[in-house]
Amino acid sequence: MKGGGKALWKDENIADSITAHAINFIRDNQNRPFFMYFATNDVHVPRFPHARFRGKNPMGYRGDAIVQFDWSVGQLMKALEEYGLADKTLIILSSDNGPVVDDGYADRAEELLNGHSPAGPFRGNKYSAFEGGTAIPVIVSWKKGVKGGRQSNVLMSQIDWLASLAQLVGARLPKGTACDSEPRLGNLLGTDSQSRLWVIEQSSSHVLSVRTPQWKFIEP
């Protein structure tokens, strides 16, 4: 790793650091369109939230990390409000996989779940081909373009976001770019309930599966 002292970090300071950088980015770009990807370390292991969040949740460090993540999102929302961008900013909150509780760190995450089921009604978790590993939550907020208070079970894939966001801003993707990304802006905005015909998925052990709106086939 290069960079000397500037390349060093403490896990408990990651949330504060990336949140501050994100707020500065919003401030510096408030007068022009921008795309910002905010990839938080919460609740990824090792889970080591800042001291001011420890003990805030009965689920131990994992719960505290979720509280810390909630704080980061709140700070970004406040920044958008402060700079007059809240009404015209499309916000997508999601995950890159299903939940994992015990990932090799002795932080008592399993013991302190207190009846909470991170994958909801689904079987499996992050590494699995079952829905618990591949079905992820998506929250979309855009005061100018999304009617709130609704839920959707429409089938789409995160790979569709590239084509969908290009569709939103009127951009044409170069030929051969993201050929498996479908423009499904209506699904994101809640104006179209037509699902994708199918999605190909793969687990960490390279097990392939095909998901349709009604069925899921996992290779034997």
Predicted regions and their residues:
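C-terminal cap/loop subdomain of S1 sulfatases and analogous C-terminal strand-loop tails that border
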Residues: P99-A129, V146-P220
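Short glycine/proline- and acidic residue-enriched helix-loop micro-motifs
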Residues: M1-K10
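Active-site-proximal beta-strand/loop segments in catalytic clefts of secreted hydrolases
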Residues: F38-V43, F48-A51, S94-N97, T134, ...
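Active-site His/acidic residue clusters
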Residues: A22-D64, V100-D102, A106-A109
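Loop/turn elements at helix/coil->beta-strand transitions in domains of secreted/extracellular proteins
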Residues: N29-M36, L85-I91, A135-I136, Q194-L197, ...
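Solvent-exposed, polar/charged alpha-helical surfaces in well-ordered, non-transmembrane soluble domains
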Residues: A20-N24, V67, W71-G74, K78, ...
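Soluble non-cytosolic domains of exported or imported proteins
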Residues: W9-S17, G60-V67, S152-I159, A178
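Metal-dependent active-site segment of extracytoplasmic phospho-/sulfohydrolases and closely related
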Residues: F69-A106
